[in-house]
Each structure stands twice: as structure tokens, then as C-alpha cells.
A protein has these predicted regions:
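Post-signal-peptide, soluble extracytosolic/periplasmic N-terminal scaffold domains
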Residues: 9-12, 19-270, 571-639, 649
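Short, ordered, surface-exposed loop/turn motifs in non-cytosolic proteins
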Residues: 49-71, 284, 664-674, 743-758
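A short, amphipathic beta-strand motif
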Residues: 57, 276-278, 658-662, 733-742
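Short, acidic Ser/Thr/Gly-rich low-complexity loop/linker segments typical of extracellular
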Residues: 69-70, 673-682, 758-770
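Short Pro-Gly-centered beta-turn/loop motif in secreted/extracellular proteins
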Residues: 75-84, 310-315, 681-707, 719, ...
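Transmembrane beta-strands of outer-membrane beta-barrel pores
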Residues: 138, 167-171, 193, 202-206, ...
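Feature captures outer-membrane beta-barrel proteins of Gram-negative bacteria and organelles
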Residues: 152, 181-192, 214-230, 366-380, ...
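Membrane-embedded beta-strand positions of outer-membrane beta-barrel proteins
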Residues: 161-163, 198-200, 236-238, 350-354, ...
């Protein structure tokens, strides 16, 4: 028995020690001669015939897009390897020192990842997937959503225009008639990493409402240039800007700013976006502005609304105006979240600005100033931070501590001291302001605590806006206390949200705003997704006390149609009720009609269209006797690059976007509303900056005879970039052919038929030259390759409309 075990062991060891190439006996194949067989690519396990292959890139089970990878000859005739370009490897997020130390091969064109201990690269040919496995210690951060700076793209040089046009005509027996035409937007120019932006507003009023005649106004609210500095994870801005500060109150400036950009940091150290909620009585337009500059505008339907997609860099106090269709307006302010200024251990973050304040009012002053702030990460997740703001006759300095509490969020506390010589009295006053901030999203209990902050200021504390401002233009009431809370909680049967803003002043009445929303979804019999919403908002200040209550019920009717009923109560004011019907066709078109009664009976009709190149809507309201209102809105954007002019739907404030090419194939749909135009281009807008973004083809909506070999592309863009990706789309047909060479012999079994220019494989030659071509495009140049050195070009392919089960002879010359 022992000898037998020893014999078996020796055999197994010898098998493990030696590995021979697989040899095929072509006699088992039904072919005429070995000369017509090319089986070299099948003789070695894991061997890939050199050439270009479109593959899915997977690194540690994370998808990194689909792209063409070149396989090169290795050290022997039976060896090949995947050439991984630096630009691709840079997106993996390796530690910078490791990435720089990796060997470059093939004249520096390829990065050798196998130099990393325990790394492996395997090409699963049957799946078209290049699987890369790397030790976790190789990565700079263990975060699947973090993309390293080396992988960020500045995009294309080009120009852009985001614009919105709103027209309203109102006829009223009580307030007169008016016609208002408004437009606002952003024009921009991208040159390398620089972004030049100009925000504009234009308005023309005519009519008798309010005693107005014809009025026209045009202004550039902001003209500035900026660029990302990835090497120091900072943003440089020149021109008209706003002080971006975690320590001091924000104000408009004209000058230069250099600051760390937390969007370049790992996601867990990035800020929260502001949340704005309220109530609309009609199809209203909600405008969010800061010191006269429109930051955001949208149309909302009657009832409760919530705006959560403002840029996370927006800070300070925002002015929100709800423009109702009957001409009335409601306004309120929202204090945006101030996330604690945290830094990792040993990291220094900074913000420096110099220039002059602007928008200070007619009687204001514009002294030169310098502002700077620093934050340094200490051990045990502590951060020490502070800042200085200095101008002639003014000095303010702050110091504070922040702490990362891990699963419990983050907290900070600071004190700011100001010393100012007042212009009107030449008196020098000194005061302090104390602040505590806290923020956290509690995933475990399904609660989002957007912001909780408290600030107390002495009577003699003076912020910079108060120091330079005009008392006739801006309120210089000295703030005493201020705090804000935004809380959302989802239960199994109920969703709730709560917001509260409170401000008190030393020489003025306090102001408060309270909001509460409750939402419930349930089923009655076979009718599912019945929604009930209850909202209450109250605003209190020295001038008025406004309370609004809203109750809404919506019942789905099937086929994307819905009935709804609402009851609203405004105090002071009357109670109004409405009943409506709405429908969405699922392709971007929606409309609604509803009627109701309040002070008067009224009826409203609305229609909206969301296309890949524009957004448009129109609405009409009348009570049949005292007023009529007609409103239209059109939003669109233009991108101009070396690829031409491309229109797309509603970019915003010159934000980041992606120009997509589909190789001239029209009507290719992508996730969302984007769809390639007749020239094969489209634009995806609203992309996050410095983060991974996946552009995806909607395979289910591909046109007939169209295929895309790389339906998913992954990239990361810098702020304001016009990115570019190409999807290898093709419109073609299938063909059944018999391939023969110029000497009359058939093309060898196993040869690969590829597109001459893209190297995309469209078929593999079978027995007797019989080949089934998939996705062949009329007029395409196809070649057959075998044995690494043999190549012939296919002559004329059979016509597209010929369908037969008999192979069509095609010469390969």
C-alpha cells in the first residue's frame, strides 16, 4: 500500500511540475488540410492572441468601465499580456508613491501591475472581462466612490451657454395688466483647466400693473474665472466671487481666492447640500437668491415642495421667493448648513482671499481686505482651526476645535472676536460671537440630521458685512442668537421632516420659520401607492405672522395617470380646495388640469416636456372673471467644441457636463433623458465634480440594427469641465459568408474577422471558411487575421437586404 501511495504521489508531483502546451489533432475536424487551420490561439491556457480587445475592466470586484485594451507579445511566443495605460491605472486609486514606482513597459506605454506582490491579471475571454486583483493595502483610500486626482479630466476646450426664458402675461381687473419677459443664465468658456463664467439676468416689463410702464433691465451679476489645482486639492478663483468661509459670514467680493476644495476629499469629509422646503398655492416659480444673485429657479406644482439639489458649496443666508401665478409672492430666508471644518491627522487645509467687498449698497464702502483661515488635523480625530479677516479699521479673528465622532457625526465649537471703528461715529467697538455646529446622517436609524447649529453674539460684535454695508440698503441689526435644525426620519409607515430657523437681534424683533411635513403611502384594495401628505409652515417676524397648512391626497389611476385633491389654509387668508388630474407618458411629456375654489373659483391647465435638448412648460390659470394668467418657460443649453455645436436640456450655472459621441449613430438613448442627435452627439449635464460617474447606454431603447460594444463608460471630471467619451456604436446587419483567399484556398479555421480601423471582432471563421458576421456595417472595411502575421481584406459584402441560409462567397484579398 505504501509503495502504491508513493508511486501516485510521484506521478502527481511530476504533473504539477511540467506543463505542456495543448496540441490539437486536426484529424478530428472535418477539414481538408492542416494548412487551412489556425489553432495557435487555443493551444495555451490564458493565452490571448495579440491585438486590441474591447473588455470590461474589473478591479477588486469594482467596475471601471469598458474600453479597448491592447494585448502585446510577452517574453515568449506562447505568452501575452494586457497593456494597461497610465491613464487607466491612475483611476484605480493606488497610493501615489506606489503608482509612481511601478515599472513601465512597452516603451513606457504600459504599467506593470504584476510588480505588486499578490497582484493578478486575468482575461476571461468568454465574458469579455479583464479581472484585476490587487491587495487592499495598495489603495490610497478604502472608498469605492473616491477617485484620485490623477484620474480627473479637465475635458475639452469649448464654450457653453445655459439659459432660461420665462414669459408671463397677466390680466387682472383689480391690479391691472402686465407682460413680463425674463431670462437668466450663465455663459462660459473653457480653456485647458480654466473656466470663465458670466452670470446674467435680463427682464422686460410692460403693462399697467403697479403703475409700471415699459421697463428693461440687464445686468451681469458675476464675472469670474476659476480652475482646479488637483496637486494641492484646491480651487483658484479670480474676479467677482463670494467669500467661501467656514469661519466668517459670507459676502460678495471682487478679487482672488485660493482655497481647499472639500469635494476633492474622500466623501465622508464632504459637506451636506442645503435643503429648502415650502408650500405653493399654484403652479409657482421658486427662486433662490443670495445678495441679489439667482442661484436656482424651478417650477413647482401646488402643495409642498422640497429643493435638495443645490450645490454643497453654497453657504450663508439664502433668500427664497415663491412667485404664484396670480401675481402674489411669499418670501423667506434659509440658513444653509455649516459643516464642521475637519481635517485628517497631519493635513493642513486653508482658504485665502484678497480684494474688495461688492454689493455693499449705495452708501457702503469698499475697503481692501485680506481673509485667511486654516485647519490642521490633530491626533484622535481632533481638528484645530481659525482665521483672520482684516481691513482698514476692521479686524476679526477666530479660533475653534472640531472633533470627528465617527458613527455619531462631527462637532465643532469656535469663538470669533471683532474690532471695528464705526464710520458714522468713529467709535471703536469690540465683541465676541460663539458658535457650535453639529451634523450627521444616521444610517442605522434612518434619520438625516442635516444641520444643528447655535450662535450667540455680543451686542458689540460686528461682522464684515455690517461694517462695510449701507444702512439704507441692508439691515445692520446686530444679531444676538441664531440656530437652525433640519431633521428627517423615515418610519416603516410614515416619513417625517422637520425644520426650524430662529434668529434674535439686539435691536429688533426676532424672526422664526417652522416647517413640518408628514407623508404616508398605503393601499386600499387593489389600489396601491395612495399618498397622503400633510404640511405646516409658519413664518414670524416683526412685520407679519404667516401660517400655511396643506393636506394633499393622490390616487394612481394606472397608466401613469393620477387623481389628486388638496386643501390649503393660509392665515391670514382663506381656505382653498382643488381637485386635479395628471398624466405622465414616461417619455418626458406630462400634463395636468385641476380646478378649485378659494377666494374665487379657478381652473388651471399645465403641460410640460422634457427632451434631450430642452425643457419646456406652459400653464394657464383663470377664475373666469377677475384674472387670467398665461406662463411659458423654455430652458436649454448649448455646448460648442471642436466636435461642433450640441444642444442639451437645462444645464445649470455652467456646471460640469459630458459630451457623448456615438460614432455618428443617431437616437441612441442613455440613462435619463439624453439621446444622441442626428450627428451622433448628446450631452449629459449636472455631473458631480471630482467623483466617479458612469455614463450608461439604455440597452432596452437601442434602435433596430444598432449595437454598442462599450455600453458603460466611467470617468471623473473637474468642476465645470466639458468631458468627452466615445461609445462604439454601430448600425449594421448580420451576414452568412464563405471566405476564400486570393489563391482560392479558404481562410483558415479559427481566423478572426475584425474591423480594419477599430479592430472590433465581428466573427470567427469556421469550417471551410464559413463565417457568420455579426453587426457588419455597410461600407465597413473588414479584415481576417490569423497566426499573428497573416492578414487579408474582405472584398464586397453581400447586400444588407439579402437574407439566406446559404453562405455568400466573399473573397479575402
Amino acid at each position: 500500500m505504501g509503495c502504491r501511495k508513493l508511486f501516485v504521489s510521484c506521478v502527481l508531483l511530476s504533473c504539477a511540475r511540467y506543463s505542456f502546451a495543448v496540441e490539437f489533432n486536426s484529424e478530428f475536424l472535418n477539414i481538408d488540410s492542416d494548412d487551412h487551420v489556425s489553432l495557435g490561439q487555443f493551444t495555451q491556457a490564458h493565452y490571448t492572441v495579440p491585438g486590441s480587445y474591447v473588455v470590461d475592466i474589473v478591479v477588486n470586484q469594482r467596475y471601471f468601465g469598458t474600453r479597448s485594451i491592447e494585448f502585446n507579445n510577452g517574453g515568449s511566443a506562447q505568452d501575452s499580456y494586457a497593456c494597461l495605460p497610465e491613464a487607466l491605472v491612475a483611476t484605480f486609486g493606488l497610493k501615489p508613491e506606489l503608482f509612481e514606482s511601478l515599472p513601465r513597459v512597452a516603451d513606457g506605454q504600459c504599467v506593470d501591475l504584476t510588480a505588486i506582490t499578490n497582484a493578478s491579471i486575468n482575461y476571461a475571454q468568454n465574458l469579455g472581462r479583464l479581472v484585476i486583483s490587487l491587495p487592499q493595502a495598495s489603495f490610497e483610500y478604502d472608498d469605492p466612490n473616491y477617485i484620485p486626482p490623477a484620474a480627473w479630466s479637465d475635458g475639452l476646450d469649448g464654450a457653453l451657454l445655459d439659459y432660461r426664458v420665462i414669459a408671463n402675461q397677466r390680466q387682472s381687473t383689480t391690479s391691472g395688466n402686465s407682460t413680463v419677459l425674463q431670462s437668466y443664465g450663465t455663459a462660459g468658456l473653457n480653456i485647458d483647466a480654466w473656466r470663465l463664467r458670466a452670470d446674467y439676468q435680463a427682464q422686460q416689463d410692460s403693462g399697467s400693473q403697479g403703475g409700471r410702464g415699459n421697463e428693461q433691465a440687464f445686468q451681469l451679476n458675476r464675472l469670474y474665472a476659476y480652475r482646479a489645482l488637483p496637486s494641492i486639492r484646491s480651487k483658484l478663483s479670480v474676479g467677482e466671487d463670494y467669500l467661501n468661509s467656514d469661519v466668517f459670514d459670507t459676502f460678495a467680493l471682487r478679487g482672488v481666492s485660493l482655497s481647499s476644495d472639500d469635494r476633492m476629499l474622500p466623501p465622508n469629509l464632504r459637506g451636506y447640500a442645503p435643503l429648502i422646503s415650502g408650500l405653493a398655492r399654484t403652479n409657482a416659480r421658486v427662486t433662490v437668491a443670495q445678495q441679489g444673485r439667482v442661484l436656482y429657479s424651478t417650477t413647482v406644482t401646488p402643495g409642498a415642495f422640497s429643493i435638495q439639489d443645490l450645490n454643497s458649496s453654497v453657504q450663508g443666508t439664502l433668500d427664497v421667493t415663491v412667485h404664484e401665478e396670480d401675481g402674489t409672492e411669499q418670501t423667506f430666508t434659509v440658513t444653509t448648513a455649516a459643516v464642521p471644518f475637519l481635517s485628517r491627522e497631519g493635513e493642513l487645509r486653508y482658504k485665502v482671499s484678497a480684494g474688495q467687498p461688492r454689493l455693499t449698497g449705495k452708501g457702503g464702502t469698499e475697503p481692501g481686505f485680506v481673509a485667511s483661515e486654516l485647519a490642521y488635523g490633530l491626533s484622535q480625530d481632533w481638528t484645530l482651526y481659525g482665521g483672520v479677516l482684516a481691513a482698514s479699521d476692521y479686524l476679526s479673528h477666530a479660533v475653534g476645535l472640531g472633533k470627528d465622532l465617527g458613527v455619531f457625526g462631527a462637532i465643532s465649537a469656535d469663538v470669533t472676536t471683532s474690532r471695528a471703528t464705526l464710520r458714522n461715529s468713529a467709535e471703536t467697538v469690540v465683541g465676541n460671537s460663539y458658535r457650535i455646529n453639529y451634523s450627521k446622517h444616521f444610517d442605522a436609524i434612518g434619520t438625516d440630521l442635516r444641520f444643528l447649529g447655535y450662535r450667540f453674539s455680543d451686542r458689540t460684535f460686528t461682522n464684515f458685512s455690517q461694517f462695510v454695508g449701507d444702512p439704507d440698503a441692508y439691515s445692520l441689526n446686530a444679531g444676538k442668537q441664531r440656530y437652525s435644525v433640519m431633521l428627517a426620519k423615515r418610519f416603516a409607515w410614515l416619513s417625517t421632516s422637520l425644520s426650524f430657523d430662529h434668529s434674535t437681534y439686539w435691536d429688533a424683533a426676532p424672526s422664526d420659520r417652522f416647517g413640518l411635513s408628514l407623508a404616508r403611502s398605503f393601499a386600499v384594495g387593489n389600489v396601491k401607492n395612495i399618498n397622503v401628505n400633510l404640511s405646516a409652515f409658519q413664518t414670524r417676524n416683526a412685520q407679519n405672522r404667516d401660517t400655511q397648512l396643506y393636506l394633499g391626497v393622490s390616487v394612481p389611476l394606472g397608466g401613469n395617470s393620477m387623481m389628486s385633491a388638496t386643501v390649503q389654509r393660509a392665515s391670514p387668508g382663506a381656505t382653498s380646495t382643488s381637485v386635479g388630474y395628471s398624466h405622465d407618458d414616461g417619455e418626458g411629456m406630462n400634463y395636468q388640469v385641476y380646478g378649485g375654489m378659494g377666494d374665487n373659483k379657478y381652473v388651471n391647465a399645465y403641460v410640460g416636456k422634457r427632451a434631450s435638448t430642452y425643457r419646456a412648460n406652459a400653464s394657464a390659470t383663470t377664475d373666469g372673471s377677475t384674472y387670467r394668467s398665461l406662463t411659458g418657460e423654455f430652458d436649454s443649453s448649448l455646448v460648442v467644441t471642436r466636435y461642433g455645436v450640441t444642444a442639451h436640456g437645462n444645464g445649470s450655472n455652467g456646471d460640469t457636463r459630458l459630451l457623448v459621441s456615438t460614432d455618428g449613430v443617431p437616437d441612441v438613448a442613455f440613462t435619463g433623458q439624453a439621446r444622441s442627435n442626428r450627428d451622433g452627439y448628446t450631452v449629459m449635464d449636472g455631473l458631480p465634480a471630482f467623483q466617479a460617474y458612469e455614463a450608461r447606454v439604455n440597452i432596452e431603447k437601442l434602435p433596430l440594427k444598432t449595437e454598442v460594444s462599450n455600453p458603460i463608460q466611467r470617468l471623473a471630471l473637474t468642476e465645470g469641465a466639458i468631458g468627452y467619451v466615445n461609445f462604439a456604436a454601430a448600425q449594421g446587419y448580420n451576414a452568412y459568408v464563405e471566405l476564400t483567399q486570393a489563391n482560392g484556398q479558404v481562410v483558415p479555421f479559427g481566423a478572426s474577422v475584425q474591423d480594419k480601423h477599430t479592430h472590433k471582432e465581428v466573427g470567427i471563421v469556421g469550417e471551410a471558411g464559413i463565417t457568420y458576421l455579426l453587426g457588419a456595417k455597410a461600407g465597413a472595411e473588414l479584415v481576417a487575421r490569423w497566426d499573428d502575421s497573416h492578414l487579408c481584406a474582405l472584398a464586397v459584402l453581400p447586400p444588407e437586404d439579402v437574407v439566406t441560409n446559404i453562405p455568400t462567397p466573399v473573397r479575402c484579398l
